């Protein structure tokens, strides 16, 4: 099926208070989305797809599918957060009966400098959210923001293993947020039960 393209930006974050306390469930933080963005563009492709980011080289890394799984044509993979977001979003899409397709995904960022040095504005969280949101548009999944947050949080935790996901919330919802994290142990138990 023909897919439309998607192009969107999500903001980075800045913790105002509670950056360390919020790692524990029930402890709040105040977070603000900043006017620095990550942009993800997705364009339909035919035989294989690609992922490209100026932070890791201007050359795209090609990918294909094997047994329904996305497989990169590259030994060193700098796109862990993007791939985790793709895998979980596409799993959601398949559960909704959506046929998967190939596409070229391009990332540009204002959250790192030109040398790839991070400013601490939540670039890994922002690229995870931007990927989920772009695929939501590309596949026309009609996810609400809470579903986008949940998928992005699970993808981020799959790569990082810990963290409050406050950066995910800021990139997902924007503006000023009072945020408390969820019980990661409960989520881990549920994931183990369902797999």
Where are these regions (language model features)?
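Charged, glycine/proline-rich intrinsically disordered loops and linkers
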Residues: 64-69, 187-195
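Short, conserved phosphate/pyrophosphate- and ester-handling motifs at nucleotide-, phospho-/glycolipid
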Residues: 124
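Short, small-residue-biased leader/transition segments that mark boundaries at the very start
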Residues: 1-5
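Alpha/beta catalytic cores of group-transfer enzymes, especially the acyltransferase/condensing modules
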Residues: 143-192
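Active-site signature of alpha/beta-hydrolase-fold catalytic machinery across serine-
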Residues: 130
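ATP-binding N-lobe of GHMP and related small-molecule kinases
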Residues: 6-121, 133-143, 174
């Amino acid at each position: 099926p023909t897919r439309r393209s998607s192009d969107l930006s999500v903001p980075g974050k800045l913790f105002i208070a509670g950056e360390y306390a919020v790692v524990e469930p029930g402890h709040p933080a105040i977070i603000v989305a900043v006017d620095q963005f990550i942009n993800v563009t997705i364009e339909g492709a035919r035989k294989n797809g690609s992922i490209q980011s100026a932070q890791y080289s201007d050359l795209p890394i090609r990918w294909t599918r094997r047994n329904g799984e996305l497989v990169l044509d590259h030994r060193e993979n700098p796109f862990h957060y993007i791939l985790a977001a793709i895998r979980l979003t596409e799993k959601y899409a398949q559960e909704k009966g959506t046929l998967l397709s190939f596409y070229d995904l391009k990332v540009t960022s204002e959250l790192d400098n030109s040398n790839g040095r991070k400013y601490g504005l939540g670039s890994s969280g922002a690229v995870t959210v931007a990927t989920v949101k772009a695929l939501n548009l590309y596949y026309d999944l009609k996810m609400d923001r809470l579903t986008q947050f949940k998928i992005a949080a699970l993808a981020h935790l799959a790569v990082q293993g810990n963290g409050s996901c406050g950066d995910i919330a800021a990139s997902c919802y924007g503006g000023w947020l009072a945020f408390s994290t969820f019980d990661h142990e409960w989520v881990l138990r549920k994931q183990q039960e369902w797999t």
